[in-house]
């Protein structure tokens, strides 16, 4: 059952400010309404005790604080009567004025009190108890407070929301109105974060049209940000940027060229010429890739002392574990120990885990302090299970915290490095440039760095192509495991994964196999079959839990066989509405107790508890199940493997149903059974690495529902999604010959 709320309007006087977060403006007020005292919560860019306000919002219930009025918009009414003036001044909003002084000011000046407070300290000093010096301070306090108020009122009249007003004031100070009036496009800067299209509207509503150069510069940065955060490009070829920006901004390429140079001189962009062509970066993207390049070279210059009896140590491990390493596996172990830095790559069944365990055993025998890390919670959990040693997410390892602009920073950094002597990092293909730069900066000099990944998978959701660029640079030791071991050769999942990588036709004709293709010619038929497999056939035949064991992976969100439509169908089948299941609407989504959900963006602020510990942070791609919805408090309790997190209603806008997810979102996870629609795949997603990534998510069973022709077409298309990045170029462009000459295996 669900609960809905209608918007209400409440008028009253602010009696008390019970809590205020100065960083984001979140405030808890006590508001007097007639004879009642209510609690109001929301974003207030500026508010004072004694003010008369009109609040628009809805009633909610908090488990700890009870009934609250959640404010979505508000208007303030300036005190008009002498009684309202007294209440406002007596509340202590202005420094130097208490109850007695407030009474004397109102008695002397009446309804014109604010006029004297604003500009006439000489008259104010005639009030008993106020010296000329005190009058100056009182007037200064009043002007300061009402300057902020005037600023926010002006900005809000331009169509800028309370949260954005606060961010703009924090970024630009008391001159913010002047800055915004002259150049509204400063609102596009990351520390404020107003989207470019909205700023265009704001600019149209200003009294005077701003200088067009401001617009063009902001448009150039907007294009680069979109390419960075949406498409993963860390840079764009300059000629392409000029062409795209000129068309987008309805100007000419020469003007864009001049503005790009100016942005570079202002240290907002970087333009760098490499051997092939010139590329343009946002300043932070360039710094991240340059930092990675520099730190890699530093680590290469601090190799560990060689191990004299390595062959005998490897033989001891083989005897103890009753195994026999292949030559490439031995090479990987020796390289990890002697070089101190290694990329270990290879597909399923090639022995990466066995090799990793050997490296770990040798590091432990040397008495090294070892840390294990992975980009996601699921990948870290799997790493822990495979090695028997705790692995942490990179964010947790680096001890994430917030800066003054609510952006994540890390306690562990170049000034406060990690205390480990060896770091083993899994799923490197998922790690973007920003996170990898932060991780490398936190490594102490001499720390060994072992990186595992599969370069045939999709690039990371974030910016860059770290694993690919590191391998292609040929600057680091790389061992690629290709031999499929006997125990994996019976698996068609493993066999077909390697056939896909080689562009060969998959094998699906074994009835007792673990890989099946079910021919369906249309998306509608594919969706119908997927629903039957998910809800009925696989649970009955394999005793699989639909929620915990089966995952539908789609190339895209759209279409009848996309995640949006399939999630609606699967939710109705495996978790239909019920009188004993609470529901909650958040944004445009309906969530129900028992739903499978996914976090779709990093949130470093959500609290979670487990049997062993508690912490903050649920990250992009984490999958959980809604265990309970409390309608009174409008909160949901969601289990993410061994952690339980509590979500407020507004935080649930960061969730999506996860019965079906995109292949991109599945990176770093494994599932007992995977079902994938492959029918009418759009050309932009008809790639080999997307199909390969989906297949390698399956541990026990892989079912493709679609057409063989479409599967063949995807497997044949080895053109990987184009990503502009400069890491490889930076690694090679200024690499010293001595370093290049010492990194071969």
Would you name each region that the model predicts?
Residues 330-333, 338-511:
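ASCE P-loop NTPase helicase motor core
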Residues 312-340:
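Conserved pre-motif I regulatory segment
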């Amino acid at each position: 059952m669900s609960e809905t709320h209608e918007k209400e309007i409440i008028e009253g006087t602010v009696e008390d400010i019970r809590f205020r977060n100065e960083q984001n403006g979140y405030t808890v007020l006590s508001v007097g309404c007639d004879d009642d005292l209510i609690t109001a919560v929301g974003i207030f860019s500026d508010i004072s005790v004694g003010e008369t306000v009109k609040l628009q919002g809805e009633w909610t219930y908090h488990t700890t604080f009870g009934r609250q009025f959640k404010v979505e918009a508000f208007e303030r009414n300036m005190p008009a009567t002498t009684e309202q003036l007294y209440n406002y001044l007596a509340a202590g909003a202005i420094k130097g004025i208490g109850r007695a002084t407030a009474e004397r000011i109102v008695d002397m000046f009446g309804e014109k009190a604010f006029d004297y407070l604003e500009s006439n300290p000489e008259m104010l000093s005639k009030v008993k108890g106020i010296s000329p010096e005190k009058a100056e301070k009182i007037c200064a306090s009043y002007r300061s407070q009402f300057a902020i108020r005037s600023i926010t009122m002006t900005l809000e009249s331009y169509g800028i929301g309370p949260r954005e007003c606060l961010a703009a004031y924090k970024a630009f100070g008391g001159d913010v109105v002047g800055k915004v009036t002259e150049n509204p496009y400063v609102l596009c800067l990351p520390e404020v974060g107003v989207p470019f299209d909205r700023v265009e509207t704001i600019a149209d509503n200003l009294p005077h049209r701003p200088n067009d150069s401001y617009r063009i510069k902001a448009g150039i940065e907007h294009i680069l940000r979109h390419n960075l955060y949406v498409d993963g490009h860390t840079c764009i070829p300059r000629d392409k940027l000029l062409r795209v920006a000129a068309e987008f901004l309805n100007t000419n390429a020469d003007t864009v060229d001049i503005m790009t140079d100016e942005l570079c001189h202002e240290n907002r962009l970087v333009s760098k010429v490499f051997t092939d062509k010139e590329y343009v970066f946002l300043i932070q993207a360039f710094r991240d890739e340059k930092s990675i390049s520099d730190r890699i070279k530093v680590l290469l210059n601090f190799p560990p002392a060689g191990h004299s009896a390595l062959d005998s140590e490897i033989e001891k491990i083989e005897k103890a574990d009753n195994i026999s390493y292949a030559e490439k596996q031995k090479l990987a172990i020796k390289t990890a120990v002697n070089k101190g830095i290694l990329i270990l790559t290879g597909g399923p069944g090639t022995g990466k885990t066995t090799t990793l365990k050997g490296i770990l055993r040798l590091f432990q025998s040397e008495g090294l302090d070892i840390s294990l890390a992975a980009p996601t919670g699921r990948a870290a959990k799997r790493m822990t299970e495979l090695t028997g040693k705790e692995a942490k997410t990179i964010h947790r390892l680096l001890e994430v915290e917030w800066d003054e602009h609510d952006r994540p920073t890390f306690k562990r950094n170049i000034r406060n490095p990690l205390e480990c002597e060896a770091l083993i990092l899994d799923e490197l293909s998922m790690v973007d440039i920003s996170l990898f730069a932060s991780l490398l900066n936190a490594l102490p000099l001499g720390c060994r760095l072992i990186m595992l990944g599969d370069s045939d998978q999709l690039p990371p959701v974030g910016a860059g192509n770290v694993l690919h660029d590191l391998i292609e640079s040929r600057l680091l030791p790389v061992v690629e495991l290709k031999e499929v071991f006997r125990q994996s050769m019976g698996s068609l999942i493993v066999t077909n994964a390697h056939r896909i990588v080689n562009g060969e036709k998959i094998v699906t004709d074994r009835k007792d196999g673990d890989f099946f293709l079910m021919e369906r010619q249309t998306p509608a038929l594919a969706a119908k079959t997927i629903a039957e497999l998910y809800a009925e056939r696989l649970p009955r035949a394999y005793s699989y839990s639909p929620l915990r064991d089966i995952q539908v992976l789609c190339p895209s969100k759209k279409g009848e066989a996309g995640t949006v439509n399939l999630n609606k169908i699967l939710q109705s089948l495996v978790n239909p509405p019920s009188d004993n299941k609470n529901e909650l609407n958040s944004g445009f989504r309906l969530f129900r107790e028992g739903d499978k959900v996914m976090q779709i963006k990093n949130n470093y602020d959500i609290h979670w508890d487990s049997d062993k510990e508690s912490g903050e942070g649920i990250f992009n791609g984490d999958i959980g199940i809604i265990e309970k919805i409390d309608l009174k408090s409008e909160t949901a309790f969601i289990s993410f493997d061994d952690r339980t997190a509590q979500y407020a209603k507004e935080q649930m806008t960061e969730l999506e149903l996860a019965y079906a997810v995109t292949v991109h979102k599945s990176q770093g996870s494994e599932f007992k059974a995977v079902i994938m629609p492959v029918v009418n795949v759009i050309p932009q997603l008809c790639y080999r690495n997307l199909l390969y990534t989906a297949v390698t998510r399956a541990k026990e069973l892989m079912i493709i529902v679609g057409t063989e022709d479409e599967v063949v077409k995807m497997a044949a298309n080895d053109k990987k999604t184009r990503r502009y990045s400069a890491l490889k170029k930076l690694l090679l462009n200024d690499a010293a010959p001595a370093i290049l000459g010492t990194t071969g295996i």
